[in-house]
Amino acid sequence: MFSFTHASPAGMIAIILCATMSATTLFAADNQKVTVVREYTEIEQRPHFDSLNAEFGVNKDLPPNFELQALLALSHYPELRDVKIRFIVDDVSIPLSSRPHWSSLLRSAKNRTYLVIIDSSLEGTREALLLKNQPFNAQVGIIGHELSHTVYYLNRSFFGIAADALCQLSDCRIGFERATDSRLIGYGLGWQRFDHASFVRREFSSNTNAVSNLEGGGGAYMSPAELLRIMQSSTLYAD
C-alpha cells in the first residue's frame, strides 16, 4: 500500500487524480441515445459521408485519408459536436495521442481546441500500428479511444489537466487508460475498440511483452477479453 507520508508532490497529485478519475469516469448519459454497431465497413458508410460531415464535422480539422473513420467515431460523442478538434497526421513516434492545445488551456472546456495526433511513420514491427495499416472498424475504434479522452477533458479544469499530465509519468496512467476504454464502451464503440485490440494481438501474438509495450505498457489498455466482458455485462450490447 502506498504511504502518503512518503509520497512526492507528483505522487500525491497522481493519487488524488486516480481517485478523482474513478469517481468521474464518464459514460453516455441515460437520456442520450447510444448507437452500437458491430462493424463499420467503408463500403456501407461511404455514401453517408456528406450527412456525417454536416452533422459532426463542424469545427473539425479531419485527418486526411481518415475523414470517414473520424466522423463515425465523432458520431458517438454528441458532446463534441461543436467542440474544436484538430486531427494532425505527423511523425510523432507514438501511434495516437490526444490532448488540449496548450494555447487554449485557460479557456472554458468547450471553448478549448483539442488535438488528436496520429503518427505517420513507425519503424520495424511497430509499423503495423500505423492507422493506415489497420482494418477500417479498428481505425474507428482507436480514434474513438482518443475522442474518449477528449470527452473526459471537457470536465477538467486547467489544474485537473495538469494533474493528468503528471499521471502519465506514474502507474496512475494504467487506471487513466482503462477508464478511457470503459468510457468508450459506454458510448457504443466497444466493438470497434475490441477489433482494434484483437488486431494488435494478432499482429504481435508471438510476443506478449511486445503487445504490452506497443499498446502502452503495463497493461494500460484492456485486452479483447476484458473489453468483451464489460460489453457482455452492459444492456447496450445485449443484441
What are the roles of these predicted feature ranges?
Residues F2-I13:
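Bacterial N-terminal signal peptides that target proteins for export
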Residues M12-S22:
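Bacterial N-terminal signal peptides
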Residues Y152-D181:
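Post-HEXXH active-site segment of zinc metalloproteases
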